[in-house]
Amino acid sequence: MPRSSLAQLAPLPRAFFNRDPRIVGRELLGKVLLRREGRAILAGRIVECEAYLGADDAAAHSAAGKTARNAVLFGPPGYAYVYFIYGNHFCLNVSCLPDGQAGGILFRALEPIAGVERMAANRQLEPSQLRLIASGPGRLAEALAVTRDRDNGKDMVSPKSDLRIVDDGFGAVEVRETPRIGITKSADLPLRYIVAGSPFVSGKRYL
């Protein structure tokens, strides 16, 4: 689909995110995460994400209750939750479940499909290094110029949002489930979702 057509697609509705994160995570695979940068469109097909189930999930940021840092997760579904980790990169999530239940999806990897040169430049890479542009949550955020100051609390369902998720009609993908990466609590739960066979997923663990 041409870049201009992607920009004209409506974002996924709030009802899409007002569900169990396990369902949302599986159904996000194959959808397009899109950033508008002025007249430019930066976009990638979602090939990897992780579900966080709310207060009952020991690995979730919401497990210890509501704080100033994680307040977005406790609000309505469909809002961007951005946090800074390891002192060097941001991670982008979207809130799920009804208001107050604090579920979420962490975006882990994209297959770049539009604005590739701009995304590569954001990562200080060449466009030919396609697999490295957004394979991993920190790389993904950097490629789309996501920061906490700019994007935390942003309504990704609003048609006016410069950060949204759209369905371009790509169709069904083969989904694989694996344990989540980089956590020590609830580490055995199969809540990481990947597009089977995609070369753009992060790392090689559980592939």
Swiss-Prot record:
This is Putative 3-methyladenine DNA glycosylase. InterPro entries: Formyl_transferase-like_C_sf, MPG, MPG_sf. Its EC number is 3.2.2.-. One of its GO terms (molecular function) is alkylbase DNA N-glycosylase activity. Pfam families: Pur_DNA_glyco (PF02245). Belongs to the DNA glycosylase MPG family. It is an enzyme of class 3 (hydrolase). GO terms for biological process: base-excision repair. Keywords: DNA damage, DNA repair, Hydrolase.
